[in-house]
């Protein structure tokens, strides 16, 4: 039986992918090292910093959502995920070839079918998908005390050992299966054992934590940037930062408290992963970055910011539209397979 999607969480999934667009838009200016932004007024600097601080949670939020509901791995689910990745890569390759920006070659097709055009996230999430039966079995059998101790140990290792002391390379600053597994187990633990206790808190409390951490990061990061350089600034907003993890969890808890039912939200959110796959394709990334720069730099800050947001919305809608084609082709393949079996 097909599960009904919870629109409140699907809205968060949709928002998280827009945060990815925002984050990469900010990074297209080589922030915080870029000379253009450093020459702008303080208000522009603080604005870009704050946008980065609220957007950096996107990856953690995406993984936490998977942990909240639990991944139920099936061959069909795996096939659907891989098909989406390959389809989006091939669409970008086809467009690049059509406009003369890329030559059609065996190596291009090989990279598309082996997921080499999907960046670091897809391989890590694919490994999480494959490992999920083990994680699910653990959370279903281990008691609350055991899970709490394991989580404390893992996050101390990540926060202190990897983030501060940098002695556990396997966490890779949050860009790894190990960090994904920690987030997955955290979401499962909170949903299974802490919801009753957290129910005493208002939903606005979690939103306050989210924006409060973002504001704190903005202020501390700005002081670090101008006082100690961009390297320190970048260290405080790694995915493995304990405050970034808390910020992401707070945002998830806020949205789980909301009530929403929307077929449109569910539909758009279902295709939102295509946004990442398409705009982060190695061939599309420079084009995306150049338009982000042009949109903001060719106008005063306020109109430039509006133009930049409009561009991000266009990218989002185009990518979701491409995923609708992917969805239709996937359903066509399934229907033909059923017809052949009957």
Regions found by a protein language model. Give the residues of each.
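Membrane-cytosol interface segments of multi-pass membrane proteins
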Residues: 1-157, 201, 258-267, 271-274, ...
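Alpha-helical transmembrane segments in multipass membrane proteins, preferentially the mid-helix core
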Residues: 128-137, 184-196, 245-260
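Interfacial loop-to-helix transition and helix-capping segments at the boundaries
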Residues: 46-59, 109-124, 164-183, 217-248, ...
């Amino acid at each position: 039986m097909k599960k009904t999607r919870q629109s409140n969480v699907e809205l968060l999934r949709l928002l998280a992918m827009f945060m990815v667009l925002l984050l990469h838009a900010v990074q297209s200016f080589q922030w915080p090292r870029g000379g253009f932004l450093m020459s702008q007024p303080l208000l522009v600097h603080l604005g870009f910093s704050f946008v980065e601080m609220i957007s950096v949670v996107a990856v953690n939020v995406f993984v936490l959502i998977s942990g909240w509901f639990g991944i139920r791995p099936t061959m069909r689910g795996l096939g659907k995920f891989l098909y989406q990745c390959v389809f989006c890569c091939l669409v970008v390759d086809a467009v690049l070839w059509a406009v003369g920006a890329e030559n059609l070659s065996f190596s291009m097709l090989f990279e598309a079918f082996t997921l080499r055009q999907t960046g670091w996230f897809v391989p890590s999430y694919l490994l999480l998908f494959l490992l999920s039966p083990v994680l699910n079995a653990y959370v279903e059998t281990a008691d609350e005390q055991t899970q709490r101790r394991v989580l404390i140990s893992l996050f101390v290792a990540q926060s202190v050992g990897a983030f501060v002391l940098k002695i556990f390379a396997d966490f890779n600053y949050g860009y790894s299966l190990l960090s994904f597994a920690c987030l997955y187990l955290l979401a499962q633990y909170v949903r299974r054992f802490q919801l009753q206790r957290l129910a005493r808190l208002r939903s606005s409390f979690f939103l306050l934590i989210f924006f409060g951490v973002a504001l704190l990061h903005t202020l501390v990061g700005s002081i670090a940037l101008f006082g100690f350089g961009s390297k320190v600034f970048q260290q405080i907003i790694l995915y493995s930062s304990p405050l970034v993890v808390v910020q992401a969890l707070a945002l998830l808890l806020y949205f789980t408290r909301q009530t929403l039912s929307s077929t449109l939200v569910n539909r758009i959110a279902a295709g939102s992963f295509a946004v990442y796959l398409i705009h982060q394709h190695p061939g599309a990334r420079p084009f995306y970055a150049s338009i982000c720069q042009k949109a903001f730099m060719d106008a005063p800050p306020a109109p430039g910011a509006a133009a930049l947001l409009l561009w991000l919305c266009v990218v989002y809608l185009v990518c979701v539209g491409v995923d609708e084609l992917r969805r239709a082709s996937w359903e066509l393949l399934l229907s033909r397979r059923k017809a052949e079996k009957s």
